[in-house]
Curated annotation (Swiss-Prot):
SMART domains: SecA_DEAD, SecA_PP_bind. InterPro entries: Helicase_ATP-bd (IPR014001), P-loop_NTPase (IPR027417), SEC_C_motif (IPR004027), SecA (IPR000185), SecA_CS (IPR020937), SecA_DEAD (IPR011115), SecA_motor_DEAD (IPR014018), SecA_preprotein_X-link_dom (IPR011130). It comes from Xanthobacter autotrophicus (strain ATCC BAA-1158 / Py2). Its main location: membrane. ATP binds at Q87, G105, E106, G107, K108, T109, D523. The gene is secA. It is a peripheral membrane protein. This is Protein translocase subunit SecA.
Length: 931
């Protein structure tokens, strides 16, 4: 109460922050007449003038007012749009590394051009981050007109570009890209073997569109690049056959935590079945030999109990395709990790694809913290303001709307059963259709959107068929859309038609059923989209007077339809249940009432809804029965809204804690990742790494000698045999250590010195034999390849450690501290192993002068994996090492030219290589069987 009174008297902190920007807005407005008088060339010349001022010592803050004024004038000329005063404020918030919360339709895309232009003047590159390729292309082409007008270059990073195209795009002043592509490029860059092959520049400044979706919803989802492992499809299919034989008493499902665990009875039953089938390697299911079997049994159980077809995934073209829980979009190529996707494929009886091994990974939380400066924009961020401040040090500022919102938000209607709820929804849709009011119906899953579609068909409505992407025949289809008795379904099944469906959702009488609208990125305009109609109806009409007249006619029609939609009350947003996140609900509401248009929103709930059921609908059901609530009646009260909001806050708090916990663990890996990646870049930049490998060799020899010759020990106490064996195995050195031990007055340091001298002589001889250039290249290649190989193994070990370290809590030990300690020990072991392997390989290496045939690299894939649901987002990630001819190495790395008829000449052959005999089979299936 007192807080509310204080806010009335002094204004909120947000109000005061916004007020603080007003003087600079006035200064920008004051420059407008002066800039209007400039020619296009003179306006463009200001860009170079700003850069000169920066070079002379001015800061970006010093240039904010004139730069923003220049962008405003440029936008008027290049785009026909003039940023409002509140949009200038949004731009200032983002320049100051904040998050601008701007309602739908307030022009976030245009706002971003203000801080983008200002920060691009520094010449370090600005990244504008979007959630999908469509938005990246659209915004880059649209706003690119303004940047080009002002003399800046623009690049686009989307799926399917090669490295040269990416390098050019990243070298541009402004680069539009998706969050996934940025993260994958960073990981791929740190798998390259030459500095010139990398595509990204240092991370300077990024503006993240739909920042809540990327930095909150996807925060706990690592980006993963992986390579394939051996095919185990038979194993998954075998495990899957036993899951349906379990009864409900054999496992416990926790919907709140989205987890499932077997009871003791279930474990015994599963153990008996697997033992009888010969799957177990030892008597007990929980013996160490069966750890892999237990893991896959648990994943198969999750697949059958926690994941629903048409809600979490769909089966399309004999593949299991994941559905994004936040947007309802289909994500072809994305795969669940750690065997879960294979378990789903076995469950659905489709082809089981092989598992993958992680080669590199990073979370969005850690990727975006690489930037010197980070900012964002969204329509809904305030509910997560604390998380943005805590993790990303970003302050959320609510930007006032240019025109006051006039949408009416009704209290929720709560029904006892889902059937009663849907009946009420159908009635409201009918009422809206009678007055030609456009309706947007939001659902939480494909399953529920299709259930509602079926109910509408039963009520006499016709569903538009979008199964054929080529089915659009322009004007005819648009006329059919306005019949008032047809509806469109927007979900993962019709992803290709998404832009068209959204563009027509504001036409009078339009009925659109949509899974979560988060991240759609397209405004629903009352009357429909004139641009979309022009694109469809006039696609075959060439430029000229006839086309101009046709365009004018369409725009007039759209304006007329807009007036009809306004008279009918604007867009009616109808929610069919509450989402776990208030933010998703607010995004759905925000689709209506853009730029001051009238609108309406209401949520219909039932006690069968997921959120209600998980958070105590039993008690509410008893209360409603006692109140005498009849069938078909709803209860409407602000108290219910508050109770639901509290339930949502609980879920949000739990999810925040989970994300925070993930970050604590990932920070451990992130610190190590930074060290390894920075070291890689240094090694790539070094032309000569001879000194580095020499230091490694000397340190290894010193440690090895100390292990077998204790300090101040007599020669009789030395482990001479152990040292002799170690020198032969690690360094390929056969030295008279036993004779040295018999010398009078010999000591450990002198032995160390002799071994170092002999090893250095051997390496000097190799350099003289092959030439310094070849030897330096070989040293660098071995060092980088070994580092990569050991790092991949290290990631796998840390991942395994993370899965089991929680059990140490039962021993009253803090799992996080245990993880940090173990991870440090593993990292120290990695560095020691790096010294050993690099030194051993260089001491043995022989170089064959023939040019080897080009060797195909193993296929690699990029995944976007959720550590809790296991989701992986995949994109092919070629990681070619460059076109430079590589000398052929023998020993541990490669082999000389092989004679198919002489196995003696084959040397060491990889298990998955083609057999040198020429059979076409893999080595492990041919001569390797006898090796």
């Amino acid at each position: 109460m007192l807080g509310g009174l204080a806010r009335k008297l002094f204004g909120s902190a947000n109000d005061r922050r916004v007020k603080g920007y007003r003087p600079r807005v006035q200064a920008i407005n004051a420059l407008e007449p002066e800039l209007e008088a400039l020619s296009d060339e003179a306006l463009r010349a200001r860009t170079e003038d700003f850069r000169r001022q920066l070079a002379e010592g001015k800061t970006l803050d010093d240039l904010l007012v004139p730069a923003f004024a220049t962008v405003r004038e440029g936008a008027k000329r290049a785009l026909g749009m003039r940023p409002f005063d509140v949009q200038l404020i949004g731009g200032m918030v983002m320049h100051e590394a904040g998050i601008a919360e701007m309602k739908t339709g307030e022009g976030k895309t245009l706002v971003a051009t203000l801080p983008v232009y200002l920060n691009a003047l520094a010449g370090k590159g600005v990244h504008v981050v979007t959630v999908n390729d469509y938005l990246a292309k659209r915004d880059a082409e649209w706003m690119g007109r303004l940047y080009r007008f002002l003399g800046l270059t623009t690049g686009i990073i989307v799926h399917g570009l090669d490295d040269d195209e990416r390098r050019v795009a990243y070298a541009s002043d402004v680069t539009y890209a998706t969050n996934n592509e940025l993260g994958f490029d960073y990981l791929r860059d740190n798998m390259k073997y030459e500095r010139g092959q990398m595509v990204q520049r240092p991370h300077f400044y990024a503006i993240v569109d739909e920042v809540d979706s990327i930095l909150i919803d996807e925060a706990r989802t690592p980006l993963i690049i992986s390579g394939p492992l051996d095919d185990r499809s038979d194993f998954y299919n075998t495990i899957d056959t036993y899951i349906p034989r379990l009864g409900k008493e054999d496992y416990e499902v926790d919907e709140k935590q989205r987890s499932v665990s077997m009871t003791e009875a279930g474990m015994e039953k599963m153990e008996q079945m697997l033992s009888a089938a010969g799957v177990l390697k030892s008597a007990s299911l929980y013996d160490i030999e069966n750890v892999s079997v237990v893991h896959h049994v648990n994943q198969a159980l999750r697949a059958h109990t926690l994941f629903q077809r048409d809600k979490d995934y769909i089966v399309r073209n004999d593949e299991v395709v994941i559905i994004d829980e936040f947007t309802g979009r289909m994500m072809p190529g994305r795969r669940y990790s750690e065997g879960l996707h294979q378990a789903l494929e076995a469950k659905e009886r489709v082809q089981v694809q092989p598992e993958n091994q992680t080669l590199a990974s990073i979370t969005f939380q850690n990727y975006f913290r690489l930037y010197e400066k980070l900012s964002g924009m969204t329509g809904t961020a305030n509910t997560e303001a604390a998380e943005f401040a805590d993790i990303y040090k970003l302050e959320v500022v609510e930007i006032p709307t240019n025109v006051q919102i006039s949408r009416i938000d009704d209290d929720d209607e709560v029904y006892r059963t889902a059937g009663e709820k849907y009946a009420a929804i159908i009635e409201l849709i009918k009422e809206c259709a009678e007055r030609s009011q456009p309706v947007l119906v939001g659902t939480t899953s494909i399953e529920k959107s299709e259930l509602l579609a079926e109910l509408l068909k039963q009520a006499g409505f016709r569903q538009k068929d979008f199964s054929d992407p080529t089915a659009f025949n322009g004007r005819e289809l648009l006329i059919n859309d306005r019949s008032g008795k047809s509806f469109a379904v927007l979900n993962a099944r019709y992803h290709e038609q998404e832009a068209y469906i959204v563009s027509q959702a504001g036409v009078p009488g339009a009925i659109t059923i949509a899974t979560n609208m988060a991240g759609r990125g397209t405004d629903i305009k009352l009357g429909g989209s004139a641009d979309m109609r022009i694109e469809i109806e006039l696609k075959d009409l060439p430029e000229g007077a006839e086309r101009a007249a046709a365009e004018a006619k369409i725009r007039a029609e759209v304006e007329e339809l807009k007036q009809k939609a306004l008279e009918a009350g604007g867009l009616y947003v109808l929610g069919t249940e509450r989402h776990e996140s208030r933010r998703i609900d607010n995004q759905l509401r925000g689709r209506s009432g853009r730029q001051g248009d009238p609108g309406h929103s209401k949520f219909f709930l039932s006690l069968d809804d997921d959120l209600m059921r998980i958070f105590g609908s039993d008690r509410l059901d008893g209360m409603l029965q006692r109140l005498g609530l009849k069938e078909g009646e709803a209860i409407i009260h602000p108290w219910i809204n508050k109770a639901l909001e509290k339930a949502q806050q609980k879920v949000e708090a739990r999810n925040y804690d989970m994300r925070k916990n993930v970050l604590k663990y990932d920070d451990v890996l992130n610190d190590q990742r930074k060290v390894v990646f920075e070291q890689r870049v240094e090694l790539m930049n070094d032309e000569d790494v001879a000194e580095t490998v020499e230091d490694m060799r000397h340190a290894l020899i010193t440690e090895t000698v100390a292990k077998f010759i204790p300090e101040n020990a007599y020669p009789e106490q030395w482990d001479v045999d152990g040292l002799d064996t170690a020198l032969k195995e690690m360094l390929a050195l056969d030295l008279p250590v036993k004779d040295w031990a018999k010398e009078e007055g010999i000591a450990g340091p002198e032995v160390t010195e002799r071994i170092i001298r002999r090893a250095d002589e051997l390496m000097a001889a190799k350099t003289a034999q092959y030439g310094p250039d070849i030897m330096r290249y070989v040293e660098k290649s071995i060092l980088l390849q070994t580092l990569d190989h050991l790092w991949r193994e290290h990631i796998g070990m840390l991942d395994h450690l993370r899965q089991v370290v929680g059990l140490r809590g039962y021993a009253q030990r803090d799992p996080l501290n245990e993880y940090k300690s173990e991870a440090f020990n593993l990292f120290s072991a990695l560095l020691n192993r790096l010294r050993e392997v690099v030194t051993a390989q260089l001491m043995r290496v022989e170089i064959v002068t023939q040019q080897p045939p080009p060797e195909e690299l193993p296929p690699m894939e990029a995944h976007h994996a959720d550590p809790f649901t296991g989701e992986d987002e995949l994109a092919f990630a070629g990681a070619a090492l460059g076109s430079r001819p590589q000398p052929l190495l023998s020993g541990d790395l490669a082999v000389a030219e092989r004679d198919p008829n002489d196995p003696e000449s084959w040397g060491k052959v990889g298990r998955n290589e083609a057999c040198p005999c020429g059979s076409g089979k893999k080595y492990k299936h041919c001569h390797g069987r006898f090796a």
